[in-house]
Amino acid sequence: MAVDQESFVHLSRPLAPNVLGFGVSNAPLTVNIQPQAVFSIIDHAVRRDDRDTQSTRVIGALVGVRSEDGSEVEVRSTFAIPHTENEDQVEVDVEYQKNMLALTLKANPRETLLGWYTTSHELNSFSALIQNFFASPETGTFPHPAVHLTIGTEAGATIDTKTYISAPVAVSPERAAESCLFIEVPHKLLFTDAERGALGSVAAAADAESRSAPVVSDIENLAQALETVSDLLERVSGFVGEVLDEERDGNHALGQYLMNALSLAPKVSNLAIENDFNNHIQDVLMVSYLANTIRTQIELSQRLATAKLDEGKEGGEKKDGEGAEGDKKTDGQRGQRGQGGKRGGRSGGAGGRGGREQREPREPREAAE
């Protein structure tokens, strides 16, 4: 009688090569991804040139920060890496990757290389080769494991993301460089309330024919947010009602999540909530009024400063013209005075000569006897 036996693969930790002096944490790895990194990857996929490569995917490097124990990483930015790929081989521009990484780390010294991304969910021997390159001590993230992010960029499809780390497997030394086992790790997208609003505006432009959406004011944005919350509450209420009426099966995880959310609600009366909401609205209106007043004052001061500069330039030009004319008149008067003085002096000299009285001739004296 044959006995069914299951096959197992034994993996030894750490996931990176064990070198004296370097230790890797055994804690589970969590990957956090910023929205700008996803947009950068999508932009790279849209702008790829199909004439230079037969590959339908693009690759690039992931840059971000890592926690002290190495159990959590945050992908903040990415940059593309040129590569060519066919059925037989794959070529990566290593020099370009080194130069771009040096420039990126120079601009953001606190960040570091985390791994690489691709726009295909397929994992093959080329993926293992690139993964080992980014995890190597010379050019990679050693002693920490390299993160591999795959993202779907098909037109009209949902953007699906997955993250992996790798572990070495027992293979021959000749194929060690192109062999590894990809292990999927949890990940999540991080975005703030401001980024959520920006993403909502971008999503609203997707359904418009002009592919553009106006930027709404704070009051309109608040009204839209309240409408969204009201719709979500109606959906949750309908779901709970259907579960209570046994029209659909319940979900224990969702029920626990709703219980936790309700427990976080403050235990205050409706009147107090309404008063707080009205106070918040007044604060928002006051901030908006002050912002508009400051903006108007800045524009007015700029216009006044510009007008004063223009008046100063015109006054300076007039003074320069009057000064030049005055200098010319002064020089002319000095010339006339000089000529008159010379003439007067000559006349005076002639008058001096003519003013002498002529002596009468003396009679000869008789000789004394």
Swiss-Prot record:
<dbReference type="GO" id="GO:0006413">
    <property type="term" value="P:translational initiation"/>
</dbReference>
<comment type="subunit">
    <text>Component of the eukaryotic translation initiation factor 3 (eIF-3) complex.</text>
</comment>
<dbReference type="GO" id="GO:0016282">
    <property type="term" value="C:eukaryotic 43S preinitiation complex"/>
</dbReference>
<protein>
    <recommendedName>
        <fullName>Eukaryotic translation initiation factor 3 subunit F</fullName>
    </recommendedName>
</protein>
<feature type="compositionally biased region" description="Basic and acidic residues">
    <location>
        <begin position="354"/>
        <end position="369"/>
    </location>
</feature>
<dbReference type="InterPro" id="IPR024969">
    <property type="entry name" value="EIF3F/CSN6-like_C"/>
</dbReference>
<comment type="function">
    <text>Component of the eukaryotic translation initiation factor 3 (eIF-3) complex, which is involved in protein synthesis of a specialized repertoire of mRNAs and, together with other initiation factors, stimulates binding of mRNA and methionyl-tRNAi to the 40S ribosome. The eIF-3 complex specifically targets and initiates translation of a subset of mRNAs involved in cell proliferation.</text>
</comment>
<dbReference type="Pfam" id="PF13012">
    <property type="entry name" value="MitMem_reg"/>
</dbReference>
<keyword id="KW-0396">Initiation factor</keyword>
<dbReference type="InterPro" id="IPR037518">
    <property type="entry name" value="MPN"/>
</dbReference>
<dbReference type="GO" id="GO:0008237">
    <property type="term" value="F:metallopeptidase activity"/>
</dbReference>
<keyword id="KW-0963">Cytoplasm</keyword>
<dbReference type="GO" id="GO:0031369">
    <property type="term" value="F:translation initiation factor binding"/>
</dbReference>
<keyword id="KW-0648">Protein biosynthesis</keyword>
<dbReference type="InterPro" id="IPR000555">
    <property type="entry name" value="JAMM/MPN+_dom"/>
</dbReference>
<feature type="region of interest" description="Disordered">
    <location>
        <begin position="309"/>
        <end position="369"/>
    </location>
</feature>
<dbReference type="GO" id="GO:0001732">
    <property type="term" value="P:formation of cytoplasmic translation initiation complex"/>
</dbReference>
<dbReference type="GO" id="GO:0033290">
    <property type="term" value="C:eukaryotic 48S preinitiation complex"/>
</dbReference>
<dbReference type="GO" id="GO:0003743">
    <property type="term" value="F:translation initiation factor activity"/>
</dbReference>
<feature type="domain" description="MPN">
    <location>
        <begin position="31"/>
        <end position="170"/>
    </location>
</feature>
<dbReference type="GO" id="GO:0071541">
    <property type="term" value="C:eukaryotic translation initiation factor 3 complex, eIF3m"/>
</dbReference>
<feature type="compositionally biased region" description="Basic and acidic residues">
    <location>
        <begin position="309"/>
        <end position="334"/>
    </location>
</feature>
<dbReference type="GO" id="GO:0071540">
    <property type="term" value="C:eukaryotic translation initiation factor 3 complex, eIF3e"/>
</dbReference>
<feature type="compositionally biased region" description="Gly residues">
    <location>
        <begin position="335"/>
        <end position="353"/>
    </location>
</feature>
<comment type="similarity">
    <text>Belongs to the eIF-3 subunit F family.</text>
</comment>
<dbReference type="InterPro" id="IPR027531">
    <property type="entry name" value="eIF3f"/>
</dbReference>
<dbReference type="Pfam" id="PF01398">
    <property type="entry name" value="JAB"/>
</dbReference>
